[in-house]
Amino acid sequence: MRINPTTSGPGVSALEKKNLGHIAQIIGPVLDVVFPPGKMPNIYNALVVKGRDTVSQQINVTCEVQQLLGNNRVRAVAMSATEGLMRGMEVIDTGAPLSVPVGGATLGRIFNVLGEPVDDLRPVDTGTTSPIHRSAPAFIQLDTKLSIFETGIKVVDLLAPYRRGGKIGLFGGAGVGKTVLIMELINNIAKAHGGVSVFGGVGERTREGNDLYMEMKESGVINEENIAESKVALVYGQMNEPPGARMRVGLTALTMAEYFRDVNEQDVLLFIDNIFRFVQAGSEVSALLGRMPSAVGYQPTLSTEMGTLQERITSTKEGSITSIQAVYVPADDLTDPAPATTFAHLDATTVLSRGLAAKGIYPAVDPLDSTSTMLQPQIVGEEHYETAQRVKQTLQRYKELQDIIAILGLDELSEEDRLTVARARKIERFLSQPFFVAEVFTGSPGKYVGLAETIRGFKLILSGELDSLPEQAFYLVGNIDEATAKATNLEMENNLKK
């Protein structure tokens, strides 16, 4: 571990100050820097530009070397705005990659891509820093235990369960509830699971980042009185930041999570919202560096960049990183190269459906499109597996019958199919659930439903014991007992109206 020249202010060592270059060209966030012969910085080294602009404002811009162009010239990408920079300005080669603070002191704090706190609290009390570029763990260090990670969300736990120490993708277009689902998972896991979390806000809205911070303070995930008791570290590189910052902020969050896994030997949760913005930032940087674009205008290095990030998110013998990543799907097209490349790395996919959101069923998780490698009888048990398969079969049959219903109506179906449709509609509504983080919108208190309760509820619906209950009794409730209580209340209300 070394002193971080990008976050330690004026303390750049005398040795590092010797390797000075100067700016030869500036094109937006990309700088060309000339160094003396034989003193070229390495790829990924951090360069620091210090000085004053034309109105004597202090400038402190950190860049990362991306290309060695020849003729003692390097091309670097800035991690912050380049306003005020001029040709000829002095550039310091720090001699190392970007390094960020790690350890317990990061909990309860908000950082930018450089590991600088941006929450207006005291400086981070740690001398321990770690470089954001490092190799993935060796094969021999990996741990391959299979166990379920309970989330308390019915549709997830039953039909596409998450793996402890696995990678999970939340896929969906704009406005179908990816961020709300991530916030609910953070809330549930912080309450039901003792480990720490790291949240990487990659290229998303600043307002959402602020809302998340406020909600975490309200729920006690971030403890304002005793910040060291907090359970989460936040790293933000928002939409308004240059592409260099958005491309590297995921690595900053991952580096903090790796320290908790490798040194503190903890189970860590890493949330990334949104992994598509990481790809998008890489595409912008690739174009700025003059690379020829690949399919649909994406960077030719898309698979390499994604693999470099994803292979570091893994479980070792020391601890685990369970990663939950929101994946924006451009124009709801799952074959787009960005979501398609992400699919290859995931253990479970939670696909959000615009059709379900339009029906008002939240979380709008598509029960037939969502998948998990964990849904096998030898892992989850026979009862869970059988229930999940029967739920999927019932919903699939309902989907097949929808065209017939639309043209001929329900009356033309056989008795058996009518029963299947009635149960499928109850299942569809029972897959909805009130969220803790959505209490302000729905007015309903949030519900955490254990896996055993979830399985019991769906078995009762499938067995036909609840066929007499109205389908609206199953909408936005927690466990099955709440549904039967709601049905009784609805019946009483109807009797009063009569």
From Swiss-Prot:
PROSITE patterns per the UniProt record, alphabetical: ATPASE_ALPHA_BETA
Chemical reaction(s) catalysed: ATP + H2O + 4 H(+)(in) = ADP + phosphate + 5 H(+)(out)
Membrane topology listed for this record: Peripheral membrane protein
Location in or out of the cell: Plastid, Chloroplast thylakoid membrane
Disulfide bond entries: none
HAMAP family membership: ATP_synth_beta_bact
Subunit structure: F-type ATPases have 2 components, CF(1) - the catalytic core - and CF(0) - the membrane proton channel. CF(1) has five subunits: alpha(3), beta(3), gamma(1), delta(1), epsilon(1). CF(0) has four main subunits: a(1), b(1), b'(1) and c(9-12).
Name of the protein in its database record: ATP synthase subunit beta, chloroplastic
Organism listed in the record: Populus tremuloides
Gene (UniProt): atpB
